[in-house]
Structures are given as C-alpha cells and as structure tokens.
C-alpha cells in the first residue's frame, strides 16, 4: 500500500498542466494503485495525479454506493489522458477538494458529460456521467489543467470554511 501525500493549495504543481501519458506501462499502473490507496485513505470521491505531485494525466473516481441511487454499486474509474468530448446542461452544487482542505463553495458544472480516455490496458474507453459523476469527472480533469474548484466559483460569497468536526457532513455533498 502506497498512500502518498496530497499536496495543498500554494504548491505550484497544482497550477501546472499535466503531461499526456504515451504508454500505459507498469509505472503508470503503479501510479494508479498509489492514487487508489491515497483517495481511499483520504475518503475522497476522486483524485488526480497532480494532487500527489505527479504531473501526469491520470485520475481516479471513487463514488461509493451510498452516494448513488439505491441498488447501484457505486463508481470506480481509472482514466488515463481523460478529455471531455461532450457536455450539456447545467448544475450548481457544493464542492470541496482534498488539496484545499476545509474549504467549500458552490460551483457551476455541466450536468452531463462524455469523457474519452484510456483504461489501464491502454484501450480507449468512453464514460458518460450525469449529476455527481459528471461533477467529479469535471473537477478531476480540471486538476490536469492546473485549475482548482475555487477558480470556477461564480459567487464568491458561497466560499466558506467548514471546520474539521463539520467536514464529514459537507463531504457527503462533495469530497473530491
């Protein structure tokens, strides 16, 4: 198990564009395992490689069953070189970020997205997401571009700090 340190706002790597992955090899698969170990330990809904200081284009999405419709097993995705190829609709919802601990704000996002990426075998996949899944995908892909959720907030008055003892409640709404 390799839980990595999640870097926080102020670290310049969070503001840099990640580099495209050319070959899905054992090094990339190990990076994916590290991302999974780290996101699970942090109890987040997603994590991008730049958040652990690695400027590579890979994300994981970890939406547990209790965040989705009853009977749905949840969502676990590893996406390499993800890009949004279609987006529609609009939603505004509370977001937080493991790299900006304790801070939350209302962020506008597309309601529906289609993402093209590679899987861990190097095969092209397309993922369609709506609602929370669409939000998490957009949030994590933003990290690959050096964009943080606070950059997307239209109404700065919604940005607020929620102390640790209240964070669990807020994470039920966000936690990326």
Curated annotation (Swiss-Prot):
Catalytic residue positions: 140
Q: Could you tell me what reaction this enzyme catalyses? A: N-terminal N-formyl-L-methionyl-[peptide] + H2O = N-terminal L-methionyl-[peptide] + formate
The Swiss-Prot or TrEMBL record lists the needed cofactor(s) as: Fe(2+)
The UniProt record gives the binding positions of Fe cation as 97, 139, 143
Tell me how the cofactor is bound: Binds 1 Fe(2+) ion.
Q: Does this UniProt record's set of keywords contain Transmembrane?
A: no
Top EC group: hydrolase
- Superkingdom of the source species: Bacteria
EC no. given is 3.5.1.88
* A single MF term (Gene Ontology): peptide deformylase activity
Q: Which UniProt keywords apply?
A: Hydrolase, Iron, Metal-binding, Protein biosynthesis
Pfam family for this entry, one: Pep_deformylase
Would you kindly state one Gene Ontology biological process term found in this protein's UniProt entry? Answer: translation
Q: Which InterPro entries match?
A: Peptide_deformylase, Peptide_deformylase_sf
Describe the function of this protein: Removes the formyl group from the N-terminal Met of newly synthesized proteins. Requires at least a dipeptide for an efficient rate of reaction. N-terminal L-methionine is a prerequisite for activity but the enzyme has broad specificity at other positions.
The family this protein is said to belong to: Belongs to the polypeptide deformylase family.
Name listed for the protein in its UniProt record = Peptide deformylase
Name the source organism.
Thermomicrobium roseum (strain ATCC 27502 / DSM 5159 / P-2)
Lineage of the species this protein comes from: Bacteria, Pseudomonadati, Thermomicrobiota, Thermomicrobia, Thermomicrobiales
